UniProtKB/Swiss-Prot annotation:
GO CC list: extracellular region
Keyword tags: Disulfide bond, Secreted, Signal
Location in or out of the cell: Secreted
Modification note: Contains 5 disulfide bonds.
Protein species of origin: Lychas mucronatus (Chinese swimming scorpion)
Tissue expression pattern: Expressed by the venom gland.
Protein name: Venom protein 30.1
Annotated signal peptide: 1-18
Record bears the keyword Signal: yes
This protein's record includes keyword Disulfide bond: yes
Length: 145
């Protein structure tokens, strides 16, 4: 009985350690003067570095929490655009992604099991509240350099 309890305890500890070792990134943005400040976190960790995008002058930002573990940054875009999200690009920049019905996901970023699509970062399961994420593109975004 004691051996079973010890084994169960070890399993629980190892699962917690595994959870904390996840290396996905996600981004938080906030309005700072006429700029958007990007806070980059390792997913489930707290190593933070700050990036500023000088081109983000028109956005007011807020944080959307899908659940306790996943946070996603949302900003209001200028007229003619839908909501957008920040993703990590393959070039290492942190572009602003624009959501627009005319845009579609680049093939390498598609994941048919999820609506939110990014090169790296959290992906949210498909449900009605996430329908707006069906057409996500990193192309033709106003904040890209």
């Amino acid at each position: 009985m004691i051996i079973v309890k010890l084994f169960t305890c070890l399993l629980m500890v190892s699962s917690v350690l595994t959870l904390n070792d996840v290396r996905y990134k996600y981004y938080k943005t906030e309005k700072v003067g006429n700029k958007c400040r990007y806070n980059m976190f390792s997913y489930l960790e707290n190593d933070e570095s700050i990036y500023e995008d000088r081109l983000c002058k028109m956005y007011t930002c807020h944080i959307m929490e899908d659940d306790a573990l996943m946070q996603h940054s949302m900003c209001k875009l200028p007229k003619g655009f839908r909501e957008g999200c920040t993703v990590e690009s393959k070039t290492g920049r942190f572009p602003y992604c624009c959501l627009n019905r005319k845009m579609s996901c680049p093939p390498e970023e598609r994941n048919d099991d999820f609506n939110v699509v990014s090169v790296k970062g959290p992906k949210f399961p498909r449900n009605k509240s996430n329908d707006k994420f069906k057409n996500l593109s990193v192309k033709n975004c106003p904040c890209l350099e």
